[in-house]
Amino acid sequence: MGISDNDVQKQLRHMMAFIEQEANEKAEEIDAKAEEEFNIEKGKLVQLQRQKIMEYYEKKEKQVELQRKIQRSNMQNQSRLKCLKARDDHLKNVLEEARANLSKISADRERYPAILKGLLLQGLFQLLESKVVLRCRKKDEEMVARILPECLEEVQRTWGNRSEVKIDNEHFLSPESAGGVELLAKDGKIRVSSTLEARLDLIADKITPQVRTALFGPNQNRRFFD
């Protein structure tokens, strides 16, 4: 018995429905997989962008904190420098006051000859040259001439050699000088300043740390002390 046209049409419709269902299921499967992959990639992209944003703000936060530290350090340094300058200015004022009082020493005609002798001896012993040119204030010239022989004898007794000292009566120390002498040897190549100002500067270099401590207290940053 042959298959009727109706049966053939029915089988064809059944086959087409099956194929269509398979195609729809496959399309849905492909869509689902594509959506899953899209969501995964989208998640990765979102996470990557979130990480970049976090890194950006972390970097900015570190930069801001660094700037704060730099500003704080600069302010501390400026404050420290101002404090140090104020201290140095005060110390300079103390030394300037001492320097201004030097003239009172040479004005004391009872004490000054002994002080002048000490300055002259210090200069001669520091120099220890056989030929020396001596410069002093013009108003001290007579006093220097009086005490010089005694100083030369003392140098000779100690050194064993005699110094020939010529008082320079053409070139004098400045009238503004507080007093003392200046000694030259080897045609001026060697020069020793034994003036009151020079001695004050020498003493100031040695005692400045002690003066700072007396005025401002010990330095908290200093680990070792003399």
Curated annotation (Swiss-Prot):
GO terms for cellular component: proton-transporting two-sector ATPase complex, catalytic domain. This is V-type proton ATPase subunit E. GO terms for molecular function: proton-transporting ATPase activity, rotational mechanism. It comes from Heterodera schachtii (Sugarbeet cyst nematode). Keywords: Hydrogen ion transport, Ion transport, Transport. The keyword 4Fe-4S does not apply. V-ATPase is a heteromultimeric enzyme made up of two complexes: the ATP-hydrolytic V1 complex and the proton translocation V0 complex. The V1 complex consists of three catalytic AB heterodimers that form a heterohexamer, three peripheral stalks each consisting of EG heterodimers, one central rotor including subunits D and F, and the regulatory subunits C and H. The proton translocation complex V0 consists of the proton transport subunit a, a ring of proteolipid subunits c9c'', rotary subunit d, subunits e and f, and the accessory subunits vah-19/Ac45 and vah-20/PRR. Subunit of the V1 complex of vacuolar(H+)-ATPase (V-ATPase), a multisubunit enzyme composed of a peripheral complex (V1) that hydrolyzes ATP and a membrane integral complex (V0) that translocates protons. V-ATPase is responsible for acidifying and maintaining the pH of intracellular compartments and in some cell types, is targeted to the plasma membrane, where it is responsible for acidifying the extracellular environment. Belongs to the V-ATPase E subunit family. InterPro entries: ATPase_E_C (IPR038495), ATPase_V1_Esu (IPR002842). It comes from the Eukaryota.
